[in-house]
From Swiss-Prot:
Record PTM text: Autophosphorylated.
PANTHER family linked to this entry: OS05G0588300 PROTEIN, RECEPTOR PROTEIN KINASE-LIKE PROTEIN ZAR1
SMART domains reported for this sequence: LRR_TYP
Main location (coarse class): membrane
First and last residues of every LRR repeat: 92-116, 117-141, 143-166, 168-190, 191-214, 215-238, 240-261, 263-286, 287-310, 312-334, 335-358, 375-399, 400-423, 425-447, 448-471, 472-495, 496-519, 521-544
Tissue: Highly expressed in root tips, shoot apices and developing flowers.
Protein name per the record: Probable LRR receptor-like serine/threonine-protein kinase IRK
Keywords for this protein: ATP-binding, Cell membrane, Glycoprotein, Kinase, Leucine-rich repeat, Membrane, Nucleotide-binding, Receptor, Repeat, Signal, Transferase, Transmembrane, Transmembrane helix
Positions glycosylated per UniProt: 104, 173, 317, 370, 470, 526, 562, 578
Length: 964
């Protein structure tokens, strides 16, 4: 019996340790599972949390003590969790760190959290949607707490006075909530605090004097509250302070001189208060300062000369005060300045020349020579709303890092320096409301990062420089109230990001470029009080433009001003290219005749009659000959005959042999009947939509005429003319220009500019001796130019459908121009069978979706054709080549070579190795990406342009490549 009792005791004592370990482990698992049940986990970040697990130590976001296996840390930052913080956490008795920041948690914070979890040292619940108030006893047992962040929530009420119990607290962040009332005095007894952030709340009352107790404080942020009264001088006792932000309160009085004791302070922000007095000279003793912001206060007097002692200063903001006098020359000593803002004061004197000089001499030299200075690192310079005079120094171009230049509302004179074009990072230039004169320098286009250009209310004259087209990021262009002359440059339409344009109150003349209607982001457009005339562009912002935006231009017409435009008919064909056509009386007026009638003598009339008789005879004989030959000989040329006089100018006649010819330029048209023939001897080539002939107009000016062979499919005359006129408005440096068109019911012609360089196909595959003269740089520029053109077409909602090397033409200087664009718009419906039959000559270029009726045809079919073209240009091979017993598809061949690491072997051997291999291989990879079988996997053409620019200029500078 006794032995059995001893055995039982030993057994219980042996099992007891095991039983003592099991329940706590189960408590941790149970607590976390209960906590998870209150959450929504859209990204399945808590999928590893399994209630059947013996221990949670391997769960995502959970960390345990290595010896006891108890949960000590729970870190679920940024898990996209939503729901509430449930009671399950209270089971984690050994938890040291709880971090749930950057989620979408809502509800209240459990008032017993800190009471139950007495081992907590770090609590971070910031950046959630927690609400409610904290009860007074919330902090009653927080002696172990070292870090507490409840920032960026929706907490309200007063900060509990029990905060004083957190005797070990080193960092307290309650910012960006709705806490109100005064700051509890208990905070100022936490002498372990290193960081205190109560900013962006609704705290009120005076700044406590007991701040001197926080002698370990390094960072203090009480900004954006309602604090009032003076800044206590006791703040100088916190000698370890490095950052102080008391901005956006209602603090008053002068700066306490104890600030100068804060030798470690590198950031002092007191902006947007009611502080007054002079900026003290002792400010120069705070030599560690990198940021000094006293803006939007009531400071007066001059900027102290001691400011030059702050050699580490990076940001100096004294804006919005009542400072007077000139800018001290010692400021030039602050060679590390990145931002200088003195706007909104009453500073006077000439604009210091040292501001715009990249000098290196010290202040002693500056006192004798104001032409040098040292703030060459400056990024933002704002001296606006002062009374500075003088000129902007030419040394402005030395400030290569400048991003914002604000000199508006001063009394500056002289020209805008041409060196403005050297500021490649400049995004804002505002020199408005001054007395600047001269012209807008054409070098302005060199500031390629410009987003905002404000030059209004000056005395500027001359033209708006077309080089402004290079500022492709420009959003705001304000040039009003100047003396600008000339016309509005059509290049403005290339600034596709423009949102605001104001050219009012100038001397501009001419018509408005129609392309401005394509600016999709434009919401403000003002051209009032100029000398502009003609019809307003149709579409875009111009459909809802306010009449006041165009007032003061008597010649403007259109629906906006409720004034119809005079119907000026197309000019008829005349033999004298120097003559003009009077649209009001239908007469041809020779040069120098003005509006006078020409009186013909009798001998002249006889001569004209005789000539007319001869012409009639010749025509009669010609007609007879043609009738005889018509049955046996096919025509070798198609004569173009036109209705004469007023009939031509209005509409085609009912005679099928008469037609309507319109030249968009308005210039006189065909010079002789012979040149108006589509002679087969002058045929340049044939495609799916018709043949192309070369002919001459306007005293030997060559053009290319495409005779459409889809007459049975072409739309009606009205639809045809409407679509062709849209195509005629397209303008791009890499687009073949459409000069005009000709229409009859049986014959339709499109008249293009003639390009002497021939097609890319001939340059690649039909060069004499098989030796193409295209260098690698030529080929890269052709690829880039083609890409930019297609991007422009897609931006204009036009799909090419037929991109291939024979449709890429070269001008005399080798620049590529894309032709045959928009022809599919002339078909009555974009039927894929019709399209595929018309572009069947583009074998190898056709995107695979043409063969699948369930896939929508988009601009990605052009991307596919472009990709094939890229590979063709780089390799010099045709898209499809037929061998004796095989067919080689270029895309497949190159893709296989790339996978085998032999991409460089595909490059055209005619280049003889004279090309950068890495660049060529990168271009090949782009071509293969563009030829993806899945349309959505192909890039947009705009993306392709950017990729090409990055390939050529990896550093990010694409100046040498131009802009689209």
């Amino acid at each position: 019996m006794y032995k059995a009792l001893i055995f039982t005791v030993l057994l219980v004592s042996a099992v007891a340790p095991v039983r003592s370990l099991d329940p706590p482990l189960n408590d941790d698992v149970l607590g976390l599972i209960v906590f998870k049940a209150d959450l929504r986990d859209p990204e399945q970040k808590l999928a590893s949390w399994n209630e059947d697990d013996y221990t949670p130590c391997s769960w995502n976001g959970v960390k345990c003590h290595p010896r006891t296996n108890r949960v000590t840390e729970l870190n679920l930052d940024g898990f996209s969790l939503s729901g509430r913080i449930g009671r399950g956490l209270l089971q984690l008795q050994f938890l040291h760190k709880l971090s749930l920041s950057n989620n979408n948690l809502t509800g209240i914070i459990n008032p017993n959290m800190l009471l139950s979890l007495v081992n907590l040292k770090v609590v971070d619940l910031s950046s959630n949607g927690l609400s409610g108030s904290l009860p007074d006893e919330f902090f009653r047992q927080c002696g172990s707490l070292r870090v507490l962040s409840l920032a960026k929530n929706k907490l309200t009420g007063k900060i509990p006075v029990s905060i004083s119990s957190c005797s070990s607290l080193a960092a307290l962040n309650l910012s960006s909530n709705g806490f109100s009332g005064s700051m509890p005095l208990g905070i100022w007894s936490l002498n372990t605090l290193r960081s205190l952030d109560l900013s962006r709340n609704e705290l009120e009352g005076e700044f406590p004097e007991k701040i001197d107790r926080l002698n370990n404080l390094r960072a203090l942020d009480l900004s954006r509250n309602r604090l009032s009264g003076p800044i206590p001088s006791e703040i100088g006792s916190c000698m370890l302070l490095k950052t102080i932000d008391l901005s956006e309160n209602s603090l008053s009085g002068s700066l306490p001189n104890t600030f100068q004791q804060l030798s470690l302070c590198y950031s002092l922000n007191l902006g947007k208060n009611a502080l007054e007095g002079e900026v003290p000279k002792w400010i120069g003793e705070m030599r560690s300062l990198e940021t000094l912001d006293l803006s939007m206060n009531k400071f007066s007097g001059q900027v102290p000369d001691s400011i030059g002692n702050l050699l580490a200063l990076k940001v100096l903001n004294f804006s919005g005060n009542g400072l007077i006098g000139s800018l001290p020359v010692s400021t030039a000593n602050c060679i590390n300045l990145l931002a200088l803002d003195l706007s909104g004061n009453s500073l006077t004197g000439k604009l210091p020349m040292w501001l715009f000089q990249d000098g290196s001499r010290d202040v002693s030299a500056l006192k004798n020579d104001n032409s040098t200075g040292g703030i060459k690192k400056i990024q933002v310079l704002d001296l606006s709303h002062n009374a500075f005079s003088g000129e902007i120094g030419a040394g402005l171009g030395d400030l290569r890092d400048l991003e914002g230049l604000h000199l508006s509302r001063n009394s500056l004179t002289g020209p805008i320096p041409s060196t403005i074009g050297e500021l490649k990072h400049l995004s804002v230039l505002d020199v408005s409301h001054n007395q600047l004169n001269g012209m807008i320098p054409r070098e302005t286009g060199g500031a390629v990062s410009l987003e905002e250009l404000r030059l209004e209310n000056n005395l500027l004259e001359g033209n708006i420089p077309s080089s402004i087209k290079n500022c492709s990021s420009l959003r705001s262009l304000i040039l009003s109230h100047n003396k600008l002359l000339g016309s509005i440059p059509p290049e403005l339409a290339k600034l596709t990001r423009l949102e605001e344009v104001d050219l009012s109150f100038n001397e501009l003349a001419g018509t408005l470029p129609k392309q401005l209607a394509n600016l999709g982001y434009l919401h403000t457009f003002n051209i009032s009080h100029n000398h502009l005339f003609g019809e307003l562009p149709a579409g875009g912002i111009f459909n809802g433009l306010s009449p006041s935006s165009v007032s003061g231009n008597p010649g403007i017409c259109g629906a906006v001003v409720n004034k119809s435009c005079p119907a000026i008919s197309p000019k008829p064909i005349v033999l004298n290219p120097n003559a003009t056509f009077d649209p009001y009386n239908g007469e041809i007026v020779p040069p120098g005749a003005g509006h006078k009638r020409i009186l013909l003598s009798i001998s002249s009339l006889i001569a004209i009659s005789a000539a007319a008789a001869i012409v009639v005879g010749v025509i009669a004989i010609t007609v007879l000959n043609l009738r005889v030959r018509a049955s046996t000989v096919s025509r070798s040329a198609v004569p173009l005959t036109f209705s004469g006089g007023d009939d031509f100018s209005r509409s085609p006649t009912t005679d099928s042999n008469s037609g309507k010819l319109v030249m968009f330029s308005g210039e006189p048209d065909f010079s002789t009947g012979t040149h108006a023939l589509l002679n087969k001897d002058c045929e340049l080539g044939r495609g799916g939509f018709g043949a192309v002939y070369r002919t001459v107009i306007r005293d030997g000016y060559p053009v290319a005429i495409k005779k459409l062979t889809v007459s049975s499919l072409v739309k009606s005359q009205d639809e045809f003319e409407r679509e062709v006129k849209k195509l005629g408005k397209l303008r791009h440096s890499n687009l073949v220009k459409l000069e005009g068109y000709y229409w009859t019911t049986s014959l339709q012609l499109l008249i293009y500019e003639f390009l002497s360089g021939g097609s890319l196909y001939k340059q690649l595959h039909e060069a004499p001796g098989g030796n193409s003269s295209l260098s690698w740089n030529d080929r890269f520029n052709i690829i880039l130019g083609t890409a930019k053109c297609l991007a422009y077409l897609h931006q204009s909602n036009i799909i090419h459908y037929n991109i291939k090397s024979s449709n890429v033409l070269l001008d005399s200087s080798g620049e590529p121009k894309v032709g045959d664009y928009g022809l599919a718009r002339l078909l009555p419906m974009l039927d894929r069978y019709v399209l595929s039959s018309k572009i069947q000559s583009a074998l190898g270029y056709m995107a695979p979706e043409f063969a699948c009726r369930t896939v929508k045809i988009t601009e990605k079919c052009d991307v596919y054709g472009f990709g094939v073209l890229v590979l063709e240009v780089v390799t010099g091979k045709k898209p499809v080549e037929y061998m004796e017993d095989d067919v080689v598809v270029l895309c497949d061949m190159v893709r296989e070579a790339l996978e085998d690491g032999r991409a460089d072997e595909c490059i055209d051997p005619r280049l003889q190795g004279k090309f950068p291999v890495e660049e060529a291989v990168a271009v090949i990879k782009l071509g293969l990406i563009c030829t993806s079988q899945v349309p959505s996997s192909r890039p947009h053409m705009g993306e392709a342009v950017n990729i090409l620019r990055m390939i050529r200029c990896p550093s990010g500078s694409s100046d040498e490549l131009g802009s689209s």
